[in-house]
């Protein structure tokens, strides 16, 4: 199966956001700007308490929004009622995002995971996507979630998000062995991703480049924020996921 569509255009990280212009990440305004610029869209999904896929990076409110609380402890209606601090946009459901994009841009959906084996978000995403016909791919840092996607929803395009090192302080829910396996991509024979999204600051790196060469897995790189990053990406990767900079 050709995934040329996945690497055809640069991908705007959390939409084409620009806080100085009042365009906040992961909002309808940022996604509309990416579509207008003919870019793909990368965005993040969290699960609400009542099982809805919500478009938001952080697992708690407060950084960009009014209000407080973890998304997993709030209903979709409660989350949608929350105001952003700097825009009239509201947090979208995945269904609302799909209605907005309507096949006009490639969608790269990062499923957030707490590495607990909870498959509710994946199940909801698969259900919502079942009636959508636009170019879409899933990805996650969690290899077990990608393995689950392969076994339960094989029609969905899936990828692994990865980097060279996973610090104990940032990834405290994971034992050292799991962090090592993720850094070296040792899970790939089981998780079987169809593409890799790898940290640009860690390129070149043996594991993703080997899999790119041997198995022809498309290699995206994140997050490109400068011409220097772009030069590195151009040498090692097939396409960029970018922000705070224009390709």
What are these model-derived regions, one by one?
Residues 1-247:
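Phosphate-group recognition and catalysis centered on beta-loop-alpha active-site segments
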């Amino acid at each position: 199966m050709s995934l040329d569509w996945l690497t055809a255009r640069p991908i705007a990280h959390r939409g084409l956001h620009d806080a100085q212009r009042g365009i906040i990440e992961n909002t309808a305004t940022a996604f509309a700007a990416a579509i207008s610029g003919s870019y793909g869209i990368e965005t993040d999904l969290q699960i609400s308490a009542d099982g809805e896929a919500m478009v938001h990076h952080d697992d708690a409110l407060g950084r960009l929004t009014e209000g407080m609380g973890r998304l997993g402890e709030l209903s979709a209606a409660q989350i949608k009622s929350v105001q952003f601090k700097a825009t009239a946009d509201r947090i979208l459901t995945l269904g609302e995002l799909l209605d907005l994009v309507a096949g006009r841009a490639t969608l790269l959906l990062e499923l957030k995971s707490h590495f607990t084996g909870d498959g509710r978000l994946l199940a909801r995403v698969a259900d919502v996507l079942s009636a959508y016909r636009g170019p879409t791919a899933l990805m996650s840092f969690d290899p077990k979630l990608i393995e689950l996607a392969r076994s339960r929803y094989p029609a969905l395009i899936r990828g692994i998000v990865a980097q060279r090192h996973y610090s104990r302080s940032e990834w405290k829910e994971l034992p050292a062995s799991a962090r090592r396996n993720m850094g070296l991509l040792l899970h790939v024979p089981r998780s079987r991703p169809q593409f890799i999204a790898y940290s640009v600051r860690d390129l070149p790196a043996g594991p993703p480049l080997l899999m790119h060469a041997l198995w022809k897995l498309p290699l995206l790189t994140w997050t490109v924020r400068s011409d220097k990053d772009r030069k590195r990406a151009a040498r090692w990767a097939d396409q960029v996921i970018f922000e705070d900079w224009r390709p």
